[in-house]
Every structure is written in structure tokens, then in C-alpha cells.
Amino acid sequence: MSKNPDLKGSSFTLSVLHLSDNQIAHTVQFLQEKIAQAPAFFANAPVVINVAKVEGDIDYPALKQGISQAGLIPVGVTGCKDKRSQNLAVEAGFAVMTATNSPAQAPAQMAPTKVIRTPVRSGQQIYAKDGDLVILSHVSAGAEVIADGSIHIYGTLRGRAIAGASGQREARIICHDLQAELISIAGRYWLSDQIESQFWQQRVMLSMTDESLYLETLTI
């Protein structure tokens, strides 16, 4: 006997594209350039579009088509200023989303730390579910290391490191030599060109402060 499906609420960490104007071509070009820098990270990733700062009408069908052609999946719009803007978004196939402050939840039971003693090669992906990840070697360009907790890399990070993958904003990324393609905590990320030169090839720690990423050098 088949069982009925169950519909429950849940929460997810999604990338948010903040528009500053209604110039769709410029937005699509920006996305294409960013995705080209880390295609594996962005491939078929869901994205929410924040239109709170946009003045004037938005060509929502063109926006949706452009985002899709860039390789992302547009799932919704937030920040609509009036009902008309909401209706235009819905007609184009967007969900209209409202940001809310969720009540604090008890932290999940953390799993034992996952330790990798060998180099992480290009094309490999290592994931520490519900726990921290320790890499005792290097992470090559094209490799990806992910943890729901923090990530410690006792070598060079040339690939991508994604900590707090399930939304844990207290997560950290610590590495002995930063040359990353991408670093991310709880959905916030920097590509290589966003990392200030003073931190390049240095021993560093990445954390989140007031919803923004914060990078500092370590002297120990």
C-alpha cells in the first residue's frame, strides 16, 4: 500500500543576486563572467533575485531567460516594491519570496571530524556531512572540499573550499597557503579575484561577521 507524500517546511542556503538597476544585459554578462571563474560551483545552482534597489519596470521574462542561459536556476524574486511588480514576476514564472527572521534552532548533532591525509586532486570532491573537515595535505585547482562545519587545510588551497554548507555561520576556513579558486561560508563566497592580495599565499582564517566574510592572517 502506497503512503501519502508529506509536505513540510524547511530552510535552505541559496545564493541571492542583488540587482542595482534594470539593465538585464549587464546583469547577464556579470553572471557569465562570475560563473566562468568557478563553473563547477555554480552549475545549475538555484538563485533568488533581490530587486529592492531597482527603479522602474523589470523585464522579468528576459531576466529569467538570461539567468537560465548563464547556467543558473532562477527560483524566485524578493524585494518587490508593489503588487504590480509582484504580478509581473509571477507572470514570468518566478515565485515571490518574502525574507523572514527564522527562530533560532538547536544546532544539529555534529559528526566526528573527517580527516583526509592525502592530496585532494583536481576533479575530486570531499564532503564532511554534519561535521568539520581536516585536510593534512594540499587541495589542487579544480578540486572541491565541503563541510557542514569548519575546514582546516594544512597545505595549499588552490581549489574550492565551502564551509558551513548547511548554513552554519559560525564555521571557519583555515588554511596554510591561500591560493583558492573560491572560498565560501554559509552561502557567502569570494572568487579568487575578490581575495585581497595581502592574503594571497598566506596562512589565513576566513569567518563571517555581520553577514559578511572576513579574512585575517594567522601568525601561529
Swiss-Prot record:
Q: Name it.
A: Probable septum site-determining protein MinC
Which organism was this protein described from? Vibrio cholerae serotype O1 (strain ATCC 39315 / El Tor Inaba N16961)
Q: What does this protein do?
A: Cell division inhibitor that blocks the formation of polar Z ring septums. Rapidly oscillates between the poles of the cell to destabilize FtsZ filaments that have formed before they mature into polar Z rings. Prevents FtsZ polymerization.
Keyword field: Cell cycle, Cell division, Septation
Subunit organization:
Interacts with MinD and FtsZ.
GO BP annotations of the record are:
cell morphogenesis; division septum assembly; regulation of cell division; regulation of cell septum assembly
Q: Does the keyword S-adenosyl-L-methionine apply?
A: no
Detail the disulphide connectivity of this chain as listed in its UniProt entry: none
User: Which PANTHER family does the entry link to?
Assistant: SEPTUM SITE-DETERMINING PROTEIN MINC
InterPro entries documented for this protein: CAP/MinC_C, MinC, MinC_C_sf, MinC_N, Septum_form_inhib_MinC_C
Q: Does the keyword Cell division apply?
A: yes
> What does UniProt give as the signal peptide span?
none
Family, as annotated = Belongs to the MinC family.
